[in-house]
Amino acid sequence: MIFRQLFDHVSSSYSYLIASRTGGEALIIDPVLDKVERYLKLLEELDLKLVKAIDTHVNADHITGLGALRDRTRCTTVMGRESQTDVVSIRVSDGDTIEIEGVCLRALHTPGHTDDSYCYRMNGRVFTGDTLLIRGTGRTDFQNGDSQAAYDSLFNKLLTLPDETLVYPGHDYKGDTVSTIGEERRHNPRLQVSSAEDYADLMDKLNLSNPKMMDVAVPANLKIGLSQDAVEARGWSLTCAQARDSLGQPDIVLIDLRDKAERAAHGEIPGSVHAPYPELEENVKPGGLLNEIATATGKRLVFYCAFGERSAMAVQAAQEAGLEKSCHIKGGIDAWKKIGGDLEGGEAKNS
């Protein structure tokens, strides 16, 4: 296991780089924009391929590195379904899993600090974002914060984990790096309350000033998505209606870029070929699956994903590889469902 806790002194933020082995796939949690070059160097030194970048919530004290890492590595971006960020590749709900080679995280929706806050559990560790800090908890007085929701997240989710679970927070201001659930239950001053009302009263009396970066960071972090308009302007997009009208035509092939778990949960467009996004670079090269399909049949590759971000990047990669007939479905499965497009498999009929 490769595990690196990386600190940004300006915002007192922790980021976490995780992989199962040297030379394998990696993910990063809560990357900071100003540290992207550091992350890229570390990835190169460890011979890692970044495949997923996760934000635990929309941060107010630093600008996220999600967009820059996506642009530099073509990684998949991940946030909670409640996030108001314009475009991310995968939106998780409580209980969902995020997987890469040899690593599995389970998403825990923990609203309170913000309404889109998530923690991620991995074996004996939990990455708590700003929900639970070492001897502290996240403030609840902005970004749809709610002290009673925070109490529920803390006492009915995080504090139900085994005492020995290691706690890795999104921030620290005193030089601490790790704690445990048991330590925080016993020694965290904000957890020494007897009711949600007591916790709300404690939090309401903090009278904290807003983070210095808040007016810059929050708007920036809501706009990290890859613009699909630029892809559309080059004639590389189909609307969902156009894609639906083209179903069954002999000159196209639909390419589903999503993970197996996404397909199982949300279904797939009938007749799709599954070519997972992390394998894209190999698949569009000469000899790769998608290159072979396109060159052997002359068919147009029509990419789709969950929200259109991965497919927009995929069509750019395919065009760069000389697959000039390729395009993508703007808005992905999310938009496809909204127009009543056909889906098969998984839980599609119930979603």
Language model regions located:
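Catalytic cysteine-centered active loop of the rhodanese-like fold, especially the PTP/DSP P-loop
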Residues: 108, 275, 286-338
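Accessory terminal helices/loops
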Residues: 152-166, 170-241
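Core dinuclear metal-dependent hydrolase active-site scaffold
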Residues: 5, 17, 97-122, 160
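Positively charged, proline/Ser/Thr-rich regional signature most characteristic
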Residues: 230-301, 346
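Conserved beta-strand hairpin/beta-sheet module of binuclear metal-dependent hydrolase folds
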Residues: 1-49, 119-129, 135
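Active-site HxH/HxHxD metal-binding segment of metal-dependent hydrolases
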Residues: 12, 23-25, 33-109, 186-187
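Divalent metal-coordination and catalytic microenvironments
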Residues: 18, 30, 57, 69, ...
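Active-site neighborhood of phospho(di)ester-bond hydrolases with catalytic His/Asp-centered motifs
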Residues: 28-31, 51-59, 78-82, 110-112, ...
